[in-house]
């Protein structure tokens, strides 16, 4: 059987005019001799099939409602039209679908080129231009203005709520006083003590004046010395300053009436109303806490008592007797 097949193949190659050795061993990577099928096809006299040709029409001459039925040749436009038709059992050409006269909406649709619907994005389309920074700044300013308006409205609402609560508390207090009698209000806190009057300021002298007087005395006493000797610059002595420290008195500075008087508060300012309500609330809490501590009689700790009594000063230094000897030496000289 195999021998018969070989003889048949040899007979076919002999009729074609191709040797068996050249078919099996001589190969080229290109042309008609690269495979047996191509060699046979080039030597056989076969009739070629006609190629399919498509007619591409422009959009202007595609189809016009004035001449229906003239454009009956299938083109690539029909392919796009068929791809767009959904829910149809069979494909139809444009001439069959557009047998009726189109409306105005259809004319606008016909002017556009039929295109197939694809899910992938079209990269050929131009990207939308980004907003300029000026427009972004304007939008940010508008948002900021809107937020400021909302904050002002919230402040006004909070101030209104505070005033309503105060009015309700006042009315409730009046009703309680009429029914159960008036309760004496808590006395206001005492004002801070006034500074002591400045008496005897002209009698006491400052440390600077004493130093000046002693310098003048020394200058008068030093005139008897020899004028040729160079005079060394005198440095202030701290012992002299410390000696007269107890006789120094501070001046009392009176505050002006403008600083003492409180600033006028606008009754319509929502921030001022809120601040006043918070002050009242926390003052009431602080007063109640202090009253509870007084009633309970909580003793203060030893550290607090010592911190209140002990003050830093020269009385904390240990007496050595050296300071007294130095002061006596200075006074003798």
Swiss-Prot record:
Native source organism of the sequence: Homo sapiens (Human)
InterPro entries: Mtfr1
Localization in the cell: Mitochondrion
Function of the protein: May play a role in mitochondrial aerobic respiration. May also regulate mitochondrial organization and fission.
UniProt-listed GO biological process terms: aerobic respiration; mitochondrial fission; mitochondrion organization
Keywords: Coiled coil, Mitochondrion, Phosphoprotein, Transit peptide
Ranges where the record places region Disordered: 177-198, 288-315
Annotated region described as Necessary and sufficient to promote mitochondrial fission, given as residue ranges: 179-304
Family: Belongs to the MTFR1 family.
Keyword Flavoprotein: no
Transit peptide (residue range): 1-48
Descriptive protein name: Mitochondrial fission regulator 1
Gene symbol of the encoding locus: MTFR1
């Amino acid at each position: 059987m195999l021998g018969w097949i070989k003889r048949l193949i040899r007979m076919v190659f002999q009729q074609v005019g191709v040797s068996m050795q050249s078919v099996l061993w001589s190969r080229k990577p290109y042309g008609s001799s690269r495979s047996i099928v191509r060699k046979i096809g080039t030597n056989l006299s076969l009739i070629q099939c006609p190629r399919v040709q498509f007619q591409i029409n422009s959009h202007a001459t595609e189809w016009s409602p004035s001449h229906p039925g003239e454009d009956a040749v299938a083109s690539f436009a029909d392919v796009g039209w068929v791809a767009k038709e959904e829910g149809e059992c069979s494909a139809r050409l444009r001439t069959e679908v557009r047998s009726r006269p189109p409306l105005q909406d259809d004319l606008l649709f016909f002017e556009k080129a039929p295109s197939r619907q694809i899910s992938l994005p079209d990269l050929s389309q131009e990207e939308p231009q980004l907003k300029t920074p000026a427009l972004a700044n304007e939008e940010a300013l508008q948002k900021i203005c809107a937020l400021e308006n909302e904050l002002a409205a919230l402040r006004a609402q909070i101030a209104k709520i505070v005033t309503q609560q105060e009015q309700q508390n006042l009315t409730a207090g009046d009703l309680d006083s009429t029914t159960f009698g008036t309760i004496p209000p808590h006395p206001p806190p005492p004002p801070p003590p006034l500074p002591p009057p400045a008496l005897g300021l002209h009698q006491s002298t400052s440390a600077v004046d004493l130093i000046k007087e002693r310098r003048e005395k020394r200058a008068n006493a030093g005139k008897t010395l020899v004028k040729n000797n160079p005079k060394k610059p005198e440095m202030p002595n701290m012992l002299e300053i410390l000696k007269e420290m107890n006789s120094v008195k501070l001046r009392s500075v009176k505050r002006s009436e403008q600083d003492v008087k409180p600033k006028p508060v606008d009754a319509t300012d929502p921030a001022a109303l809120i601040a006043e309500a918070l002050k009242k609330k926390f003052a009431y809490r602080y007063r109640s806490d202090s009253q509870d501590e007084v009633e309970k009689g909580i003793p203060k700790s030893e550290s607090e008592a010592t911190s209140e009594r002990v003050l830093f000063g020269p009385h904390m230094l240990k007496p050595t007797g050296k300071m007294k000897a130095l002061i006596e030496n200075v006074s003798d000289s």
